[in-house]
A protein has these predicted regions:
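Double-stranded RNA-binding/processing signature
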Residues: 1-235
Length: 235
């Protein structure tokens, strides 16, 4: 566990006036329990508050940036931006896991890299920033670290966004659709110049195929195509 909180504050772009808020946001229930601390010292309540703040700030930004979007399109973007998968990516980028206060059992079970645990800690951090410095500072954190993918997904579906597979997975889940299924349907060319065709399907009605020089790139392009169709038909 790292204790140089100044480095973490630099990574997130906010220096706490009251560092107790930051420490609480980083304190998992397992650590508080082992130290016999009251529930008010762990990050669960901050997570609860941060979830609401995040939802509001993301919704506010989307409505402002896309006045012509129907509710369905806005919901697709929001569902991805507040998803555990996306918040997990945010946590990894700022190195949040390295600074968490965990109980011994959680530490041994890999808590520093668990998706749900890190996503919850990001929500707690948003609440901590809000309590420390107000909603405008929380908004700056959300814009800087969470809304970066929104422009790539919403404004330019043909942009070089690299995680359409992750976005499609989360959106399918939020819409109660089957999980995307990826199938390599064709491989052509010599070993040094192989081309792959990958199909992604959601249920039996929504599918797309794409070519690429790797299975990964073909899968991402196919996921991008299905994502575009979901956006076009969302109302």
């Amino acid at each position: 566990m790292r204790t140089d909180l100044e480095a973490f504050e630099t990574a997130i772009g906010h220096v706490f006036r009251n560092r107790d808020f930051l420490i609480r946001a980083l304190t998992h229930t397992s650590h508080a329990y082992e130290k016999s601390q009251p529930p008010s010292q762990d990050n669960e309540q901050l997570e609860f508050l941060g979830d609401a703040i995040l939802g509001f700030l993301v919704s506010e930004s989307l409505v402002s940036r896309y006045p012509g979007y129907h509710e369905g399109r806005l919901s697709i973007l929001k569902n991805y931006l507040v998803s555990a998968s996306h918040l997990h990516e945010v946590a990894q980028k700022v190195g949040l896991g390295e600074f968490l206060l965990l109980g011994r059992g959680e530490e041994l079970s890999g808590g520093r890299v668990k998706k749900g645990l890190l996503a919850d800690a990001v929500e707690a951090l948003i609440a901590a920033i809000h309590l420390d410095a107000g909603i405008d500072e929380a908004r700056q954190f959300v814009v800087r670290h969470i809304l970066g993918a929104e422009q790539e997904l919403g404004e330019s579906i043909d942009s070089p966004f690299t995680n359409f597979k992750g976005a499609l997975q989360e959106i399918a889940r939020s819409l109660n659709l089957p999980s995307p299924r990826y199938t390599v349907v064709q491989e052509l060319g010599p070993a040094h110049a192989r081309r792959f065709t990958v199909e992604v399907a959601i249920g039996s009605d929504l599918a797309a195929q794409a070519d690429g020089d790797s299975k990964k790139s073909a899968g991402q392009t196919a996921a991008q195509m299905v994502f575009r169709r979901l956006m076009e038909h969302a109302e």
